[in-house]
Amino acid sequence: MVPSHLRHRPPTFAMQASVMLLAAGRSTRLGALGLTLPKPLVPICGHPAITFGLRAAAQAGASRAVVNVFHRGDLVRATLGARASGLAVDYAVEADLLGTGGGVANARALLGPGPALVMNAKVVADLDLPALLAEHAAHGATATMLLRDDPDPQRWGAIGVDATGRVVSILDARSPHPPEGAVTLRMFTGVQVLAPALMDRLQPIFCDLIRDAYVPALRDGETIRAATLGGYFAEHSTPERYLAGNLALLRDPGLLRDPPGTLAGVDPEARVAAGARLIAPVRIAAGAEVESGAEVGPDAVVDAGARVVAGARVRRAVVWSGATATGDVSDAVVTASGVVMVNAEAA
């Protein structure tokens, strides 16, 4: 719970932390999709996934972010450039993949001496970052983890939280301090605030932020706090989760308080022929083309530079930039390299 005197502070207070988005993973679980685009750039209703986190940080008062890159790092840098979503962007380039822990350590010079707000670039969530930072500051914690309820937190690596909001267990590690009240198991969202003391445990070699920093800090009795995310959350590590994330926001754009752009509807700059049929909800981006005789929707996203030809039927699908949809396309992602079928029930 954030104390009342810390709520609604101006952005200059809220962002007394540097910002980092973790964007260097290999994207292997995305399969063929990850060969075309790295996870930070997969489009969610037409916007690269990483821009959702950047936008949230900008709205919280940040002016700059650090992004680490490895897999397809050149493409990430070319897409975001020196500014993205209202933030100046600096890049921590990894010659070898360093993992979540090594990635943070490698970026320390760019992050500066204070605390760091670190987010996973594949995550899209309804974030209240000022509240998270206020919670961290109120308790002087070594780290503050943004957690959420999940029916099966064990599959993500459960985090145990006591009645006061203190983290008492991470994976199989336990705090030496007994919990106060009941312990609830929750899922870690990949959004966190790290004090310098926690980052000092990391080296710029391949290592894991949880296992190589959080776990030893917890076992040493350091204070790790938990904040709770009550709103929308999605991560896009697999084709199934990727498609589900697109469709969730397409159906209900109001799940996010401040997305990086429009999530549903037809952009005025889209080229939709008079003889095309659109069945809501759809997102037809600027520069997308839907030919006469094509049917798009329900539940379809056509990205900028994508094309749906005459006679095609697209539903429960995303058509990426540079791709052409033909025939009957459903439960799929269409890329310039081909169609990736998605098992929607596996999401």
Sequence positions of predicted segments:
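Intrinsic-disorder-associated, low-complexity terminal segments enriched in Asp/Asn/His/Tyr and depleted
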Residues: H5-H8
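N-terminal glycine-rich phosphate-binding loop and ensuing alpha1 helix
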Residues: P11-R77
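A structural signal for short hydrophobic beta-strand segments in well-ordered beta-sheet cores
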Residues: L41, I159-V161, Y214, A226
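Glycine-rich phosphate-binding loop at the start of an alpha helix
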Residues: T51, G101, A105, V282, ...
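Short internal beta-strands
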Residues: V66-V69, L146-L147, V318
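Conserved beta-loop-beta/alpha segment of the NTase-like Rossmann-fold superfamily
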Residues: V76-A163, Q203
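Catalytic-core segments of class I nucleotidyltransferases/pyrophosphorylases
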Residues: P115-L117, V124, P130-A137, D150-P153, ...
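Structural signal for interior beta-strand "rungs" in well-ordered beta-sheet cores
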Residues: P260-A347
